[in-house]
Curated annotation (Swiss-Prot):
Catalyzes the conversion of 3-deoxy-D-arabino-heptulosonate 7-phosphate (DAHP) to dehydroquinate (DHQ). NAD(+) binds at G107, V108, I109, G110, D111, T131, S132, K144, K153. One of its GO terms (biological process) is amino acid biosynthetic process. This is 3-dehydroquinate synthase. Signal peptide: none annotated. It is found in: Cytoplasm. It comes from Roseobacter denitrificans (strain ATCC 33942 / OCh 114).
Length: 370
């Protein structure tokens, strides 16, 4: 069971290989990239405890030596001090420009390690081995790397494409139900932004996906990655179409900031709630029928996911403060906030023509329900 999606960027093309049993075969996939048989792996402590020795064995089968650094798990690792620690460790390992760094973990590790690779010796190659559903379908593909700032999420970073992505769906079996469903928020996003047929497939197959059906998981990852690859090829540095991939993120990032990037709200949970709010805003503006946000929420609820602000534990700031947090989003251009809205399921578009009063009303209604 192996699917390959080619991200066909001029001069920087790479494969995303999706399947079962890729970790034990990692050496065979990575070896053709190496000038000498060694790699530096950066992971987090949770993934290290579960999968690091399997990766070491998979690399050793092809004679590849591995050194490893395990950072604390969690969003707080996506910040300056862990970045400095990672770069310092890579320099201590004497990683050369011709070597390969491996990002082995979820979205936090992929973003951090990709950024470290981008700035180390002005750019070394790296391989993504994503271990969460969110990372497999989204953050490991497309070359966005970076860290968070006190002022907002993903505000410091670089575009740096990986040389290879290995998405082994077997490792998804070690995720908690909450982490798996957080990643599913990004999967649903793809159907909502541009593929109604995929969303309908998810409505039918989502429960099997969550229950561990390998065929369904492979298909969901493949379709998500293919859609992202197609968009990235058209617009690598987010000058146009790539912004569609931020459906749900303008609201979601503000909610993450409001909860202090803590365990109260995982990134994918914020995206799922953000998608529901984006469709609510679209309906309020008369762009789509009220049936669209209702159907989005119905599917998320059926999957046991967070769908509304009342699903977030603890207090939240008021609507005006949330709107101000949205203004820190990296999608602001000339002081104007860009929204990804929709004319219906699978029909998203980018616009800055949104009245602040409409956004405030949607947020106030959502907070009232809390």
């Amino acid at each position: 069971m192996l699917d390959t999606v080619r991200v066909d960027l001029p001069g920087r093309a790479y494969d995303v290989r999706i399947g079962s049993g890729l970790l034990p075969e990692a050496g065979g996939h990575v070896l053709p990239l190496l000038k000498r048989p060694r790699v530096a792996v950066v992971t987090d402590e949770t993934v290290a405890g579960l999968h690091l020795e399997a990766l070491r064995a998979g690399l050793a089968r092809d004679g590849i030596e591995m050194s490893a650094l395990a950072l604390p798990a969690g969003e707080a690792t996506k910040s300056w001090a862990p970045l400095e620690r990672t770069v310092g460790w890579l320099l201590d390992q004497k990683v050369e420009r011709g070597d390969v760094v491996v990002a082995f973990g979820g979205g936090v590790i992929g973003d951090l390690v990709g950024f470290a690779a981008a700035i180390l010796r002005r750019g070394v190659r790296f391989v993504q081995i994503p271990t969460s559903l969110l990372a497999q379908v989204d953050s490991s593909v497309g070359g966005k790397t970076g860290i968070n700032a006190a002022q907002g999420k993903n505000l410091i970073g670089a575009f740096h494409q990986p040389s290879l992505v290995l998405a082994d769906i077997d490792v998804l079996g070690s995720l908690t139900a909450r982490d798996f469903l957080a990643g599913y928020g990004e999967v649903v996003k793809y159907g909502l932004l541009g593929d109604l047929t995929f969303f309908e497939w998810l409505e039918q197959n989502g429960p099997a996906l969550a229950a561990g059906d390998k065929g369904a998981r492979c298909e969901a990852v493949r379709r998500s990655v293919q859609m992202k690859a197609d968009i990235v090829i058209r617009d690598e540095t987010e000058q146009g179409d790539r912004a569609l991939l931020n459906l749900g993120h303008t609201f979601g990032h503000a909610l993450e900031a409001a909860t202090g990037y803590s365990d109260r709200l995982l990134h994918g949970e914020g995206v799922a709630i953000g998608c529901a709010l984006a469709f609510e805003l679209s309906a309020r503006m008369g762009l789509c029928s009220q049936e669209s946000p209702s159907r989005v929420r119905a599917h998320l609820k059926a999957m046991g996911m967070k769908t509304d602000l009342h699903d977030i534990p603890g207090d939240l700031p008021d609507a005006a403060c949330l709107l101000d947090l949205m203004g820190q989003d990296k999608k602001v251009t000339q002081g104007k906030l860009h929204f990804i809205l929709a004319r219906g399921l699978g029909e998203a578009f980018v616009t800055s023509d949104v009245a602040a009063s409409d956004v405030l009303m949607v947020l106030e209604d959502a907070l009232r329900s809390k």
